[in-house]
Each structure stands twice: as structure tokens, then as C-alpha cells.
Amino acid sequence: LSCIGMNQPHVMIGTAPAASSLLFRTEDEYSDHLFDQHSWAPAIEYADSVGVDVINTSLGYYTFDDKSKNYRYRDLNGHFALMSRQASRIADKGMVLVCSAGNAGMGSWKKTTPPGDAENVITVGAIGKNGELAPFSSIGNTADNRIKPDVVAVGVFADIIGTDGQPSMANGTSFSSPIMCGMVTCLWQSRPELAAKQIIELVRQSGDRVDLPDNI
């Protein structure tokens, strides 16, 4: 949250410090089950009902306690995972979903985690402040050969306010995603006449590799 909403001059200012925020907790931190994805949907529906414009989701799934439910690369088509199907429809409701690409880049999985494979969402990878890709940042393409992540933001030594209320730094696409989410919020504020899908495409076109895209 501090990546977006912090507003303490000379300490830290987030990327959308004047935005109003709602927090939703949708998963059981002590287990990994498909049910967590079912819990996510009501949060999105409630956000829609109260007029939320931009949503950040710093979570993703590809392994579960029941290993038979683990996703495979061929499942990353934006339609197989329940959460990805739900995410793909958010822009049709007039909201923009910004989500973390995942931190599996150095493991055997490597790929973007659902819902980051969804269509009509902004999937965010991580870079350092020097512009270099974070080695842990999950990569694409999707199984149906769409470019993912869509863009990147700082996720290595990202500035945050810790749970103790003190300035700190952290690594992960869980931080690059809200940093980008705040930027998207300010962009939409400046161009309120644009629809959600137009904002998504505008952000994609802002990347410095838009003319020669790669999968990282």
C-alpha cells in the first residue's frame, strides 16, 4: 500500500498519494488451494460495486497443496485458470487490473503466474533502479504466444514503508505492481475520457521495447 499511497515528504511519496484505497484480503496465508481464487472474485465484485477504478493484485498461483492441481505451461492461455478468466473480464466492467508477474524467474517454473496470463490486464515484471531486469521476475510468453509481462517497474530494493512503520526496501513483483498501479491511476486521472482497455493499451505502448518486444 505504501508504494501507492504513502505521502510523507522527505521520507516517501507513493505513485498515487492522493488516491483513495480499499484493502481486500482474499487468501489463506497458511495454505495454497484453488479456493483462494474463488475468494478473490467477491472482492472484485465488491470493488466494482463501490466505484473502484484501478485494482492492484500482488499475488499469483501455479502450485497448490494438492499437487495434482498444479498448473502447467500449456494452461497459461488466459482462460484455463479461474482467476485468469475472472481477471480478463474486469476491463469490460470499466476497471483496470494491474497484477504482479510473479517471482519464479530463477526456478524451474519461470513463467508468469495466473492471473498474470490474463487478457486485458497489465502484468508487471520487476527491474532494478539501474533498469536491469530482476533475475527472479517471471517471464512469458503465454501458452497462446502473447507477450507478458506487459511492462516493468522497480521491484529490486523498492522503497516501501515496513510493517513497523519505518522506511525500508523490498524485492519482488509484489512491489513493482503497485508502483505501476499508482502510475496508471494518475494516468487515468489525467485522461478520464479514455475507457479501461484504452488505458491498458496506452500503458503497453509506453514501454521502451514496444517496437521490439521480448518475453521478459
Show the residue positions of the predicted features.
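Internal glycine-rich alpha/beta core junctions
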Residues: 137-158
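Structural detector of well-ordered beta-strand residues that form the stable sheet scaffold
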Residues: 22, 96-98, 123, 152, ...
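Glycine/Thr-rich phosphate-binding loops of Rossmann-like dinucleotide-binding domains
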Residues: 65, 131-133
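Hydrolase catalytic cores
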Residues: 1-3, 22-28, 111, 155-216
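Carbohydrate-associated surface elements
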Residues: 127
